[in-house]
Amino acid sequence: MMQKCLSPKTLIAALVVLSACGRADHLGKAPSFTPNTESPEHVAMLWPGLPLHTQPQRSVDRASLWSGGQNSLLGDQRAMKKGDILTVVIEIDEKAEISNDTNRSRSGSESLGVPHLLGLPQRIDEKLPEGASMSNAVAVDSSSASGGKGSVKRKEKLTLRVAATVVDVLPNGVLSITGSQELRVNFELRELLVSGYVRPEDISRQNEITYDKIASARVSYGGRGQITDVQQPRYGQQVLDMVLPF
């Protein structure tokens, strides 16, 4: 069977169509939300799975008016198993300033001459061009200097709260959480994604955890829509910036 090669025009047309697919969703309308049924949170809630360790059932105290279970009034309401929900508090207020200044200089000189050596320099001087002499045969001077200066100044402030779902419980008891939030304002959709690993004992009694107690934390705050499209360079310009060496 013979394989047909695509022409350059066909390839260019295909690339143009593919580059427009990401924006076709919000062409002339507001961007669509991501379906909840496709999220890992939905899967974790739908299939909580079996516990890794089976705990023996505690006997019921008939003399007490309160139940000791998680769903009771005095029970522990914190997230602890797959499918449970907790609140992630993100309060980032960071400021960093770095300044470096480097100066380096070096100089050296070397000279070599043979004014007297058994009369040989005088014999050689007669054969050399006018002005040349063995008394100052070699002289080398060198110098180098370099300097550098750099500074970094950044400031970030972000305050958010998002509900996350326990998507997995590791064998050591650590909880793997994932949370997402979408907010659409006019023709712009803001997206907040958070994921990481937390210890059950770090979760507060209010079923909340701060971002600085999340291991391998991944926090993404961005969006998609008409404003984001205008802020980004065109795909052709991005390709040229990557390919052109000047």
Swiss-Prot record:
Lipidation sites, kind S-diacylglycerol cysteine, are: 21
**Gene name, Swiss-Prot/TrEMBL:** flgH
Which processes are annotated in GO (biological process)? Answer: bacterial-type flagellum-dependent cell motility
Per the record, the domain of life is Bacteria
Assembly and oligomerization: The basal body constitutes a major portion of the flagellar organelle and consists of four rings (L,P,S, and M) mounted on a central rod.
Fetch the PROSITE patterns from UniProt.
PROKAR_LIPOPROTEIN (PS51257)
Tell me, what does this protein do in biology? Assembles around the rod to form the L-ring and probably protects the motor/basal body from shearing forces during rotation.
What keywords sit in the KW lines? Bacterial flagellum, Cell outer membrane, Lipoprotein, Membrane, Palmitate, Signal
The entry lists its GO molecular-function terms as: cytoskeletal motor activity
List the Pfam families hit by this protein, alphabetically: FlgH (PF02107)
* KW Ribonucleoprotein (keyword) present: no
- Name the family: Belongs to the FlgH family.
Q: What is its main location?
A: membrane
**Organism (species):** Ruegeria pomeroyi (strain ATCC 700808 / DSM 15171 / DSS-3)
Record-level GO cellular component terms: bacterial-type flagellum basal body, distal rod, L ring; cell outer membrane
Location relative to the cell: Cell outer membrane; Bacterial flagellum basal body
Which N-terminal residues, if any, form the signal peptide? 1-20
InterPro entries in the record, alphabetically?
A: Flag_Lring
Membrane topology category: Lipid-anchor
Q: What is this protein called?
A: Flagellar L-ring protein
